[in-house]
Amino acid sequence: MDIQFLGTGAGQPSKARNVSSLALKLLDEINEVWLFDCGEGTQNRILETTIRPRKVSKIFITHLHGDHIFGLPGFLSSRAFQANEEQTDLEIYGPQGIKSFVLTSLRVSGSRLPYRIHFHEFDQDSLGKILETDKFTVYAEELDHTIFCVGYRVMQKDLEGTLDAEKLKAAGVPFGPLFGKIKNGQDLVLEDGTEIKAADYISAPRPGKIITILGDTRKTDASVRLAVNADVLVHESTYGKGDEKIARNHGHSTNMQAAQVAVEAGAKRLLLNHISARFLSKDISKLKKDAATIFENVHVVKDLEEVEI
């Protein structure tokens, strides 16, 4: 499980940073990629990665500001041109209006897609659990921005316990099909009469990962709730230390406020993105250094960076 950042800039693209988008790569878990936001130029960034557009099965939009959605028509169209690959349907989750934006863009441009898009729109009254599969659950909660905006909490369901092969060998169980039966929870009796209780050779279930991905927001309790015990918290950092007033006026957060959210939520790691173009390289180092005085395990991400979860 990895996150690859396709756009880490704020508001408009710069030479160093494209506008908002990231890919949650779940290839080992479910052979899918989930995209969060799709700012202008996202498809160009994808060309610089190993991501195959057909693997993108779901797109989650945080809000309808242009720097988070203007890349959708282009990406959706390019996804249709995957030579020799089976076309697969796509799901888009987002605030009310995202369906109208996508369909209008495709209609006006005369674009026809060989796959179906299934839209899941929500508003303030229809948040909470928005998706559940056999391996993941996704929650959405409203944040505090200048327009309706949400954050997402992706929870991987608990993983099966692992089989203790060495302990089985010591008990006289020959390697082979019996291992598979025990792994599936089946109790056995060996030829010599030894009883093998599967539960004695399988570890307890392992807790799944929690990934929190926030849209643009002021500091708010909703961010903390979404990030409780998160393995990774992706939080915007449009402004730096001392800019709390201007950040609030524009519906954004500082690096220090993001760090405070991480502390209050008990998150394990904080990844700062949505970085303003006014921050030069030396300023990026300061963003991290200042935030680390509050929450030590912090990192300022850059375009195309990949983070293992």
From Swiss-Prot:
Q: Does the keyword Protein transport apply?
A: no
One GO molecular function term of this record is: 3'-tRNA processing endoribonuclease activity
- CDD domains xref list: RNaseZ_ZiPD-like_MBL-fold (cd07717)
Catalyzed reactions per annotation: Endonucleolytic cleavage of RNA, removing extra 3' nucleotides from tRNA precursor, generating 3' termini of tRNAs. A 3'-hydroxy group is left at the tRNA terminus and a 5'-phosphoryl group is left at the trailer molecule
Q: Which SUPFAM superfamilies match?
A: Metallo-hydrolase/oxidoreductase
Q: Where is the signal peptide?
A: none
Q: What is its EC number?
A: 3.1.26.11
Query: Looking at its record, which EC class is this enzyme?
Result: hydrolase
Provide the disulphide bond pattern: none
Q: Which cofactor does it need?
A: Zn(2+)
Is tRNA processing among the key words of this record? yes
Q: Which residues bind Zn(2+) 1?
A: H63, H65, H145, D216
What is this protein's function per UniProt?
Zinc phosphodiesterase, which displays some tRNA 3'-processing endonuclease activity. Probably involved in tRNA maturation, by removing a 3'-trailer from precursor tRNA.
Quaternary data: Homodimer.
**NCBIfam families annotated for this entry?**
PRK00055.1-3 (NF000801), RNase_Z (TIGR02651)
Q: Which family does it belong to?
A: Belongs to the RNase Z family.
Q: What is this protein called?
A: Ribonuclease Z
Species whose genome carries this gene? Streptococcus pneumoniae (strain Hungary19A-6)
